[in-house]
């Protein structure tokens, strides 16, 4: 569940489009009728405070971020199958059938596009959510150690 001020900062459509036009976002995308974007100010504030940003982006967001000054390290957590995606969505019991179908189609597109050369630095296969999480944490810890050992 998305939470204001924790996962996202919600603004109305007019405000976000105005911010996008002004160049206040590193990346932005529209997904399932919502507009998502990464604020330059938020990322710069984190960097000034020696914090590392972990972002949850779609494929277009990753592409956009790769074309910035940030030098991001990108990880794709790949489902083992589209059936797995569908099963997880059904188990959540939060979407109607047509919405589940739409999300599965989007997942298929993402899985295909994730193979684009240079887009992701690491791909984790999510055959077991706990194992995938452990792999992600290990990658993050390694990257943090590497960052602080060189800076």
From Swiss-Prot:
| Keywords for this protein | Kinase, Transferase
Q: Which Pfam families match?
A: Guanylate_kin
Residues of the Guanylate kinase-like domain? 1-141
Q: Does the keyword Transferase apply?
A: yes
Q: Which domain of life is it from?
A: Viruses
| Entries under CDD domains matching the protein | GMPK
Entry's Gene Ontology molecular function annotations: guanylate kinase activity
Q: So what family is this one in? A: Belongs to the guanylate kinase family.
Name of the featured protein: Guanylate kinase homolog
